[in-house]
């Protein structure tokens, strides 16, 4: 859950988000070291007069500044590719949920259950109950079982949308005429908030997403009551 004046990432709630957080820290350290080196060299150039204006050829230096960046890029690319394939693959999902973006709300269909589908609209500010979050609450939450792999099929009925829940490491475009896939796995129960992350019109800011992750037994009771 985000909090005011937050500068870092939200707490990781899924294995994918944990990997993304680690990759962020790994890449940020490389960027920090390179930036420090560049600033150090610039400061030396500005504060000293030790220059080589007559140097026309330096093959050793050119070799170093060609090979070293290539090695650094490999160190960044390999972990990135690993996470990319982890996000793409899903084996034996226990549940499939189809998500459709509309102007300006989301609709959900639990394809493993007959007639279990609903629309999810933002709760207006004047209808909020004490403790609820402005611009983030919805009238129908997406209830899912925790600690189990769930497949989300995401598309759109009209314009481009993007289904995003930061604490779960999820952000998938909703494209008309195309089904995109995302994997949802939560390590713990709770409410996880997201929003449409693709500008889709005048009410783009009023398309919140709320996932309620619960134990499997509670999910079965909820699904039975909804059918």
Swiss-Prot record:
Signal peptide: none annotated. Keywords: Copper, Electron transport, Magnesium, Membrane, Metal-binding, Mitochondrion, Mitochondrion inner membrane, Respiratory chain, Translocase, Transmembrane, Transmembrane helix, Transport. The chain crosses the membrane at residues 15-45, 60-87. Residues 46-59 are mitochondrial matrix. Cu cation A1 binds at residues 161, 196, 200, 207. It is found in: Mitochondrion inner membrane. One of its GO terms (cellular component) is mitochondrial inner membrane. Cu cation A2 binds at residues 196, 198, 200, 204. One of its GO terms (biological process) is ATP synthesis coupled electron transport. Its EC number is 7.1.1.9. InterPro entries: CcO_II (IPR045187), CcO_II-like_C (IPR002429), CcO_II_C (IPR034210), Copper_CuA (IPR001505), Cupredoxin (IPR008972), Cyt_c_oxidase_su2 (IPR014222), Cyt_c_oxidase_su2_TM_dom (IPR011759), Cyt_c_oxidase_su2_TM_sf (IPR036257). Residues 1-14, 88-227 are mitochondrial intermembrane. Mg(2+) binds at residue 198. Its cofactor is Cu cation. It catalyses: 4 Fe(II)-[cytochrome c] + O2 + 8 H(+)(in) = 4 Fe(III)-[cytochrome c] + 2 H2O + 4 H(+)(out). Component of the cytochrome c oxidase (complex IV, CIV), a multisubunit enzyme composed of 14 subunits. The complex is composed of a catalytic core of 3 subunits MT-CO1, MT-CO2 and MT-CO3, encoded in the mitochondrial DNA, and 11 supernumerary subunits COX4I, COX5A, COX5B, COX6A, COX6B, COX6C, COX7A, COX7B, COX7C, COX8 and NDUFA4, which are encoded in the nuclear genome. Component of the cytochrome c oxidase, the last enzyme in the mitochondrial electron transport chain which drives oxidative phosphorylation. The respiratory chain contains 3 multisubunit complexes succinate dehydrogenase (complex II, CII), ubiquinol-cytochrome c oxidoreductase (cytochrome b-c1 complex, complex III, CIII) and cytochrome c oxidase (complex IV, CIV), that cooperate to transfer electrons derived from NADH and succinate to molecular oxygen, creating an electrochemical gradient over the inner membrane that drives transmembrane transport and the ATP synthase. NCBIfam families: CoxB. Belongs to the cytochrome c oxidase subunit 2 family. This is Cytochrome c oxidase subunit 2. It comes from Praomys taitae. The lineage of its organism: Eukaryota, Metazoa, Chordata, Craniata, Vertebrata.
């Amino acid at each position: 859950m985000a909090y005011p004046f937050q500068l870092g990432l939200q707490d990781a709630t899924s294995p994918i988000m944990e990997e993304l957080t680690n990759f962020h820290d790994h890449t940020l350290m490389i960027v920090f070291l390179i930036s420090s080196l560049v600033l150090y060299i610039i400061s030396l150039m500005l504060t000293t007069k030790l220059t080589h204006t007559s140097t026309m050829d330096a093959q050793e230096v050119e070799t170093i500044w060609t090979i070293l960046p290539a090695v650094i890029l490999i160190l960044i690319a390999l972990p990135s590719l690993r996470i990319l394939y982890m996000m793409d693959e899903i084996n034996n999902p226990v549940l499939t949920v189809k998500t459709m973006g509309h102007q300006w709300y989301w609709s959900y269909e639990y394809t493993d259950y007959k007639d279990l589908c609903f629309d999810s609209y933002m709760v207006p500010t004047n209808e909020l109950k004490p403790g609820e979050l402005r611009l983030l609450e919805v009238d129908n939450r997406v209830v899912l079982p925790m600690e189990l792999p769930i497949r989300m099929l995401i598309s759109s009925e009209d314009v481009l949308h993007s289904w995003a829940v930061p604490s779960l490491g999820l952000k998938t475009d909703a494209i008309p005429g195309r089904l995109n896939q995302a994997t949802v796995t939560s390590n713990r129960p709770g409410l996880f908030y997201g929003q449409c992350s693709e500008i889709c019109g005048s009410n783009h800011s009023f398309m919140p997403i709320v996932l309620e992750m619960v134990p499997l037994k509670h999910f079965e009771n909820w699904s039975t009551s909804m059918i």
